[in-house]
């Protein structure tokens, strides 16, 4: 079944408990979006287990540089070959997304055929796992707004674009 967006990311190892919790919160938020699929890339510790737990695709054999950093070209190649969606979105594995994300992607397509979508993020240090029960999005939005920590515009945490482009 064709999806709207394929998210793909190369998470850090899940060995540091705080980083693991942040990444798990983010990946879980992606899986709750309507009409998306998720691809996790790399063979870092814990990725295979998290992919299995959340029911997402996992491709461990992404090419890396000498330092072990995944190559963007390899990430894009794997995502293109293994996605079934109109849009691709390379995303940092600490970005929590909410349900308006998919709608913005769909509306962007109505504006023009070729585009790259990115945005400014709100910084928020999450100290515990998110309870993804009903109402989690409105509760998180309110908490984040109270902190009022809008990240400077230079952050590049995701790039969403039509699969047919770039």
What residue ranges belong to the model's regions?
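Short, hydrophobic beta-strand segments that form beta-sheet elements in well-ordered domains
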Residues: 36-43, 117-118
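Short loop/turn segments at strand-loop or loop-helix junctions that form parts
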Residues: 6-13, 59-63, 119-122, 161-164
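Active-site-proximal specificity loops/subdomain of glycosyltransferases
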Residues: 40-91, 98-99
